[in-house]
């Protein structure tokens, strides 16, 4: 208590740069003035943050990029000493929390919560002692172009505010599918920011629809599978997630995991916690060995409740990190060291996880009484919730998850130098690599594609590759000068695998970066009759092929089919002529 009082007085002296203490009435947000009916536009939002910066040396505003429509991607840095670099802040022994709002700009809860949370610290001195141990980065509006596409019809089933932005960007991209492929200029700027600051905690604020329940807020932390390193996964469960639930319940906003049910609209049938891959925000943090919290506020709850609950989640998270920062920093360092070690690669890395029935726990789930009636409008069964009758259900929560798809990590990847767009992504994701200065012969494991299944619909402006089939073999190949060598003895080695492995969900193969080799379009301009000459030549030169041909000729049907005979040689020549057409350009150096 004494430390908190002293910290508050010191910060008050530091943060107020004008002669008189600001009038608190001047810092009521536009959202509060409207009784949480309205949310401000981008210009008004940043003007408010600038107003706080004008009276506090702890608040700095900068830009980390520009949107396609030319708007600033604004970043608000809050540090007790006014520091503006991660190195300087960490030298002071503080941890960093990145709070991102409006990645889907029709979901503005985090933006208004950030304004009020920071105002309460700077102007009202509430929880000001948090700044002794924590510095904050706020992105008030990530999808800034979508945010300015204001309309009352963008999310008609959402309970406020009355006008808001759109889910997608001006380029019609969903930023929360873009963390790996980074098609959007906004995301490319964000990746540079994130990989420079590497915040200990990243909070991404959303609003969800779907199931109906009493909770104002649900959440996700990708710690059910093995995406998060085991030591950090345990820390996130035993300390962060446990205390977050306790603290939110104490302030009147109990929370629950972002979940689905075994049967539609029936939590009592079993609650399943979905796992995600690093194309999504909280999972991108997890694969970096950092905490990622996805907040999914409930779309049917009043906007005021959602904003106030979000503020409490910010405070609770910051308090947990402030009180446990030494153990968190140590755990993260150990996680980075572990995933960069040869020991980590002794076991396959899971890519897909699925819940299994062998373990579950009974939990209380705050729901509503419901009944099913025959709709007089559509004739369908209509499930209706009775908001006058809150109920607590005892439900099984599945706690066991097993990997259903895995890959053995190599010692290194070798990527051919002509794949410049992929190499650019390695830089954006801060994946370290070296380049060969001259050609080098190496024994590598390769993938050769034999079949690909493409989506019949576009996604994010791309045609996803839903499934690939390929052979795996060891080959001795000459790697050309300029080839990129990605040593897996680095914390971001796992991220390289998520990008380059064909079977990884959300990989660059999935998004079509390698379509030229997944399904080669090169034509083989040799006519079948030429095989009359070439076949004889091959039989003279290649004893193994001659033996194979003679074995085939024992089949009477084959021996009588002149086209099949010529095609036998045709396929042999085609395979030799275009032996690299279906070769995946990321080769694997195995132990």
Locate the predicted segments by residue.
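Accessory, solvent-exposed terminal regions and/or long lumenal/extracellular loops of proteins
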Residues: 492-494, 500-591
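C-terminal motif of bacterial Sec signal peptides marking the signal peptidase cleavage site
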Residues: 14-17
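Bacterial N-terminal signal peptides that target proteins for export
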Residues: 1-6
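Feature captures C-terminal
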Residues: 372-526, 531-534
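Hard-cation-handling environments
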Residues: 261-444, 448-449
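Acidic/histidine-rich, surface-exposed loop or edge segments in extracytoplasmic proteins
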Residues: 22-37, 99-101, 174, 227, ...
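Soluble metallo-hydrolase cores and metallopeptidase-like ectodomains found primarily
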Residues: 43-97, 124
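Active-site/substrate-binding loop(s) of hydrolase catalytic cores
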Residues: 91-100, 108-267, 273-276
